[in-house]
């Protein structure tokens, strides 16, 4: 009896550890793995994947707000999370992403002088950024073509931005990401434990309809 109970405890602990890793981590552009377009982004790997996030601006110029790409192509910042500043991120190459505003359906792009703006059509040269992380854990974005970091600033003319520090950002998950994790945990604890099975919570057969990747619309 004790041996059977220990088997159940081990199985439950393994499943809980897997779920914790899946829903608690913030994606970091540090490692690479091959993932299909349909798979959700759960850990730190990069592939051809899409994720829904807000981009929180943490300074040093504009701070305490969320980046938004307006329908007229301008880029500004809003204090609250809402449908207007929800962004889609897609990894188009190793540690390289495209960013698209869900509401305005415009891609974040950069001109030769470092100005950021929104385009309806994706341009591989102007709308592709390398996602980097500094020593303090902030995300920074550098244009692959122009070799300039995004400097999110509204007060100074663009010609005065040379040698300025990059803007710091924190990607914030959309609440649906955590709701999916809650659904998965709730379903797991409602299932009878089958200690003799390789899938004691029957998660493999049911997980597909619970976890879905957000679509990256063209």
From Swiss-Prot:
Subcellular location, record wording: Secreted
Keywords: Growth factor, Secreted, Signal
Leader sequence segment: 1-25
Tissue and organ distribution: Expressed in the developing brain.
Amino-acid biosynthesis in keyword set: no
Gene name linked to the record: Fgf15
Subunit note: Interacts with MALRD1.
InterPro entries named among the record's database cross-references: FGF15/19/21, Fibroblast_GF_fam, IL1/FGF
Domain of life of the native organism: Eukaryota
The protein's role, per its UniProt record: Involved in the suppression of bile acid biosynthesis through down-regulation of CYP7A1 expression.
One of the GO BP terms on file: bile acid and bile salt transport
UniProt record similarity statement: Belongs to the heparin-binding growth factors family.
MF terms in GO: fibroblast growth factor receptor binding; growth factor activity
Name listed for the protein in its UniProt record: Fibroblast growth factor 15
SUPFAM superfamilies: Cytokine
Organism, as annotated: Mus musculus
Keyword Signal listed: yes
Gene Ontology CC: one annotated term: extracellular region
């Amino acid at each position: 009896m004790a041996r059977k109970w220990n088997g159940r405890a081990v199985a439950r602990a393994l499943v809980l550890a897997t779920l914790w890793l899946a829903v608690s981590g913030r994606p970091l552009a540090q490692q690479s793995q091959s993932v299909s377009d349909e798979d959700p982004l759960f850990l730190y790997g990069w592939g051809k994947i899409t994720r829904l996030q807000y981009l929180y601006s943490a300074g040093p110029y504009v701070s305490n707000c969320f980046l938004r790409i307006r329908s007229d192509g301008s880029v500004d910042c809003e204090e609250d999370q809402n449908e207007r500043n929800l962004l889609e991120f897609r990894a188009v190459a190793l540690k390289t992403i495209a960013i698209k505003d869900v509401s305005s359906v415009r891609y974040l792009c950069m001109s030769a002088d470092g100005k950021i703006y929104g385009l309806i059509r994706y341009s591989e040269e102007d709308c592709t950024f390398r996602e980097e992380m500094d020593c303090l854990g902030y995300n920074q974005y550098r244009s692959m073509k122009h070799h300039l970091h995004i400097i999110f600033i509204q007060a100074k003319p663009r010609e005065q931005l040379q040698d300025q520090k990059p803007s710091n950002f924190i990607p914030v998950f959309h609440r649906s990401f955590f709701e999916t994790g809650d659904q998965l945990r709730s379903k797991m604890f409602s299932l009878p434990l089958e200690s003799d099975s390789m899938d004691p919570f029957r998660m493999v057969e049911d997980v597909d309809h619970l976890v879905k990747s957000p679509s990256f619309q063209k």
